[in-house]
Amino acid sequence: MSPARWDLPPELCCRPMAFVALTGLDVVYNAIHRAIWDAFCANRRADRVPISFKVLPGDHEYPKCRTKRTSYEWYIPKGILKTGWMNKHLNLVPALVVLFYELDWDDPQWKEKQSECATKVEIVRTSLQGRNTKVAVVLIQKKTPLPPGEDLVASERASALCGACDLSGKSLFVLPHTDHLVGYIIRLENAFYEHAQTYYYNEIRRVKSHKEFLNKTTHQLLFVRHQFKMGFFSELKQDTQNALKYYRTAYSLVHELRAHETNVLEIKTMAGFINYKICRLCFQHNTPLDAIAQFRKHIDLCKKKIGSAELAFEHTAWMSKQFQSFGDLFDEAIKLGLTAIQTQNPGFYYQQAAYYAQERKQQAGQLCSHEPGVGYPAPDPLETTSGALDFYGQRPWRQGHQSIDPPDSEKEKQGILALQVKERDVLHSELIIALLSNAVAQFKKYKCPRMKSHLMVQMGEEYYHAKDYTKALKLLDYVMCDYRTERWWSLLTSIVCTALKCSYLMGQVKDYITYSMELVGRASILSEEQKSRIEKNLIKVLMNEVPEPEPDCDPVSVKAAQSLWSDRVSLAGNNEFTIDVQDYVPFVQCKAKFLSPSFHIDEPVQLHVYVRADCPHPVRFSKLCVSLSNQEYNQYCLLEDAYKGKDILEPSSQENMCLVPGKTRKYCFNFVAKTEDVGKKIEITSVGLMLGRETGRYVYLNWRGGWGDAASSHESLQASRSFKRRTRLPEQHVDWDAVSVQSSTMIISRVPKISVQLTHEPPALTNEMFCMTVTIKSEEDTVGKDIKLTAGLKPGQDANLTQSTQITLNGSEVCDDSHPALLPDIPLGDLQPGQKIVKPLYIRCVSTGSRIFLFHVAYSVSATVEGKDITCKCHKDETVTVETVVPFEVAMKFVSSKFEHLERVYVDIPFLLMMDILSASPWPIELVESEVQLASSMTAIDQPQSQVEGVTLQTSECASECFLLKCPPVQNGTSTVASGHYIISWKRKSTFTETSVVRTVITLPHVMVENIPLYVHAEVPSFGRVRESLPVRYHLENRTGLVQDVEISVEPSDAFMFSGLKQVRMRILPGAEQEMLYNFYPLMAGYQVLPQLNINLLRFPNISSQLLRRFLPSRIFVKPQGRNGDASIEAA
């Protein structure tokens, strides 16, 4: 029985489209006709109407229409649906026949061609005798027709042609062969589509009209048939909603049929067809839940309709095909835009289809295992006269039989036998693998890794049963990683057993060794007997012998495998294998560890390797080697059996090279590190354990990183989380779970035996030469040679700090930018035991902030390790954080002679520069000297001398000094000029060390200088006395090149009487000076306001009187009158 027998017919699975036949086109020899045909069928877009076109000759014979039945009273149907009915209406019986005929309206032979066209139409009608198929005529014309109504000749001849051909006006079309051919074709298609819809509508009505003649006693099959036909015609009409309604009715009716062994296959077949149509339309209507519900209902209704027990495999084959077909529909809908999810995707249906295919295989094995003498029956009961069945789902030897009992029991037996024999020849594994492959692809697409792995295991097992061991092993090996990672030990054991059988039957030595080691180990759930058998086979392979066959293997395959293994044994080469155990769970475990995360160069590096076996019997290894990142040390980490030629089963002279099951062996290695490895990490790259002999066959178990297989990480985690109290083991025994892994170690320098002391007085002051004394004292037993000091700013800090820090050994010189921030490798010579070296360093910090300074002392000493003389390089680092602060803050301001703040100064008018020095240092500061370097735009009235020289300031104390200055004339009326620099020489007062003088230069602020036209100043005594005359002389100096007209008035004061001009107007020549004398008579004692002088410059109205008199004193101290005037005057 061919698998194709269960495939759905292609006419059921395709999308039904209206069938339109085109006649009168010579597409081979006529280029115009070919262009018309290409426009109809080539590169059709999705938005064009769904029509299936076919070019047929004009005299084509269409299927004959049977005589219509007038009564169904005595009619008994022989089946539900004929096998050729769907194809007939899809490809054989057209809804419309279109006759193409070349004829122009102005053709000179119009009459003859009109008659010829009518004849061709009549021929088509004759061939369609009894059919309701429409006929239409398309005139192929060379000219573009005029708009309707304008060409009277065309209208008349069109009417005449319709009359001659017996056509309605809607069935006659004109097709001009112009550049716009495709546009005309699309318009024709739309018209053809309307005619086709009318045809299928009439067909539905015709089928529906039969219902009144039917009864439910004898015509149950016809009810199903008619509903199916109406649904199919509705699909051809593209009325999918009504089609779904008819199909649902048909599905209900098909399950109302009385089922028995002779017709159950036909019922299931038609139910499957109708279910397929319903599900397809539900997906098409974007109602996937309805499709799924319908399919589940379909399976529930049909899964128990098995039929003949002798043909039970047919039922499982049919069930498998149902799931596969629905999976195909689901997948097709997804490709068209439907969204699926993890829990509902086509993979589940393909998986179920594979399950039924596996059941089919199992049932076929039970039902089709005939005796060797039983062959295929003759004559063939499955042959039919036509080569095909008349009705879907019927038996070839009893077509049309609808009664409960078979007509001929002998034929029934022969037919069943023929089906069983054909089923025996079916390659079930191929069917199962194809379905599982589809399911795996879907679960991979929807990210269901466990489902994917599960099905891949089934595929591997199916390949194994199909004797395709290569593919089976490839698939099983792929999924083993997942099961190892997730620790499904029972599943993994089953998979590895199958893989072991495959590797044995293929003669794959390495795979056989690998899987044997895993099945013998702790992850396997096999019994001790099975493990023991596998271990013995493993030892045989390592001894280059042929292993015993695995149980339950195909005898023919075993025989071939034994021949393969014999060839493997006879081969001299290819006997060395390496297995990376990280991907497996072998029966040997390993942990390698350094005893410390770091070792000093003057002590040996110690390494322990722990090995444990989980196999049933003791096993001996021949070599254990540790590979380190520095391969020069590998020679010290090697354990080898001295007697390499001995047999693997013979006892070894080295007892510790035999691994006893469940007992942990410890192997110790040590070596002396090289001095050039100081500061480097040494890592365990791998540990190798050799089973077998180099003279024969051997396998290297390789642990990358020195420990661990596919199960070790989880076991270590479980052990660390366990609250189980560990039993105390004897001293010589090792608790495997208590062994931790240390796969790398650092070689560090020898512990230095020197002391480094730093002496300094923090914080550092900006720009000073900050002294830091380094004292190095030796505590070594031998001479420290080649001592070098690296001192300065610790690397890795802010780049700005590096640029603003300088260090030197010479404290007498001031550092500049040429000095580095770090002095490397300062040679200090040798250091005897107990000797001390003192080294002062001077650091200049230009900016404030916190800095970390490093003092690195390196030297070398001689030492003996494990009898080897080595030179050890030692070093000691000391760091210190030093804060840098400003020593003082300088406040500068310009004031007038009355000590009023000035925002601007005036040409040749004296003013004061005030300097306030506030100490911010926690240490006393001595001000050695100060000076003012004036710019050319400013001069001193007298020789400026330092007023703070020798002053010592404590924290927060302030020293002040002032300088009397004036500005010479400027070019413009107003300008901003530089003042110069203020230079302070200072030093820290320290009892710790002699400090150097620091010279700090401070830039004085710029000041705005203005010219003033009239300078007014006064000569006033330092004080006055009540009721005594107080002479005041005012000087008015013209500073311009113009004659100044000046108005002067005196505002009286309540505290004074005065004599002199109260109001005067005068003229002052350029550069001249005018004096005015007043006698003031004080009336009250104390600080009194002098009478104010109001000055008005007529040539400079913008100059205010207030500006001019700011240079004049406004108050004076008046003493009270004494009892003895002379004595008081002398006292004053």
Swiss-Prot record:
The entry's localization annotation reads:
Golgi apparatus; Golgi apparatus, cis-Golgi network
Q: InterPro entries, per this entry?
A: TPC11, TRAPPC11_C
Q: Which UniProt keywords apply?
A: ER-Golgi transport, Golgi apparatus, Transport
Listed under subunit, the entry gives: Component of the multisubunit TRAPP (transport protein particle) complex.
Taken from the UniProt entry, a GO cellular component term is: Golgi apparatus
Family to which the UniProt record says this protein belongs: Belongs to the TRAPPC11 family.
Query: What job does the chain carry out?
Result: Involved in endoplasmic reticulum to Golgi apparatus trafficking at a very early stage.
The protein, known as: Trafficking protein particle complex subunit 11
A Gene Ontology biological process noted in the UniProt record is:
retina development in camera-type eye
UniProt xrefs under PANTHER family: FOIE GRAS, TRAFFICKING PROTEIN PARTICLE COMPLEX SUBUNIT 11
Q: Does the keyword Transport apply?
A: yes
Q: Does the keyword Flavoprotein apply?
A: no
Principal place of residence: Golgi
Q: Give the matching Pfam families.
A: Foie-gras_1, Gryzun-like
- What is the consequence of disrupting this locus? Pronounced hepatomegaly accompanied by lipid accumulation in the liver.
